[in-house]
A protein has these predicted regions:
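Bacterial N-terminal signal peptides that target proteins for export
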Residues: 1-9
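N-terminal maturation segment of proteins
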Residues: 17-112
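Bacterial N-terminal signal peptides
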Residues: 8-17
Length: 112
């Protein structure tokens, strides 16, 4: 009887810990997915030619700003999103999101 109770307790602890880990991983995935969505939206807004090439015509009436102020604004944008990305534990992301996060990180670092 004691062995059955101990086995049941261990099983419940395992299930609880697995659930907690999955919840943490899902939270990291949701956090990254929101960041990625915000990044893409801002990227299309600040690079209207790319938006048009990709079929998003909301910014067709604009051109990219290549002035010093525009370059500084894009640099600040890249730094902001890189810092937000660094705050996410990539090890907790799903495989697909982990790959996307690494691609995003490489792109942000390249643009700095």
């Amino acid at each position: 009887m004691l062995k059955k109770v101990a086995a049941l307790a261990l099983t419940l602890i395992f299930v609880l810990l697995t659930t907690m880990a999955n919840t943490t991983n899902q939270t990291a995935d949701r956090q990254f997915e929101k960041l990625a969505k915000d990044y893409i939206e801002k990227l299309l807004e600040t690079s209207p030619e790319w938006a048009t090439i990709l079929g998003d015509h909301r910014f067709d009436n604009r051109l990219s700003d290549y002035s010093l102020a525009g370059v500084q604004k894009r640099r600040a944008f890249n730094e902001e999103f890189l810092n937000k990305l660094k705050a996410i534990d990539l090890a907790r992301l799903s495989k697909a999101n982990n790959i996307d996060a690494r691609i995003m990180r490489d792109n942000l670092e390249y643009n700095l």
